[in-house]
């Protein structure tokens, strides 16, 4: 038997549902809208959150039913983690897929769900609008940010 944590001994396809869910650090970055340049495919971050994101807890307000309310919500699965190029470099799913370890502030490492916020990684205090506030696509341009404005 190994004393190593599951994320150091398993790949994403080997995780139980509970392990998969616990890998989420609760940063909320995946719930921010991103823009993609049609010509270059470059991804641009915004500080506009999904209507279901609680900006204080950085958790989904209706996680079990999110696809019903937000049809384009992306369900992360082991099969698509490598294909989702907008996942933050700090994302635990991305880190495990790359064979890297989790950061000290990840709740599985620190033992506290608050460290992701204390470390400045989460979107707490950084959401400037919600998608239901946007009248048209151009409105998102007013909320463009660089990724370092989201995570310190």
From Swiss-Prot:
Disulfide bonds: none
InterPro entries: Puta_zinc/iron-chelating_dom, UCP006173
Superkingdom of origin organism: Bacteria
Matches recorded under PANTHER family: UPF0260 PROTEIN YCGN
Family: Belongs to the UPF0260 family.
Name of this chain's protein: UPF0260 protein BCAN_A1514
Upper lineage: Bacteria, Pseudomonadati, Pseudomonadota, Alphaproteobacteria, Hyphomicrobiales
């Amino acid at each position: 038997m190994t004393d190593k944590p599951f994320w150091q001994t398993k790949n994403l396809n080997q995780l139980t549902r509970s392990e998969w869910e616990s890998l989420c650090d609760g940063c909320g970055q995946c719930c921010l809208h991103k823009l993609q340049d049609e010509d270059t495919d470059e991804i641009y971050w915004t500080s506009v959150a999904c209507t279901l994101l609680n900006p204080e807890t950085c958790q989904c307000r209706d996680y079990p039913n999110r696809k019903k309310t937000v049809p384009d919500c992306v369900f992360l699965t082991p099969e698509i983690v490598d294909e989702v190029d907008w996942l933050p470099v700090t994302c635990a799913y991305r880190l495990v897929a790359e064979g890297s370890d989790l950061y000290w502030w990840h709740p599985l490492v620190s033992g506290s769900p608050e460290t992701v916020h204390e470390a400045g990684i989460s979107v707490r205090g950084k959401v400037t609008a919600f998608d239901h506030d946007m009248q048209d696509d151009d409105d998102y341009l007013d909320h463009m940010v660089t990724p370092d404005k989201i995570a310190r």
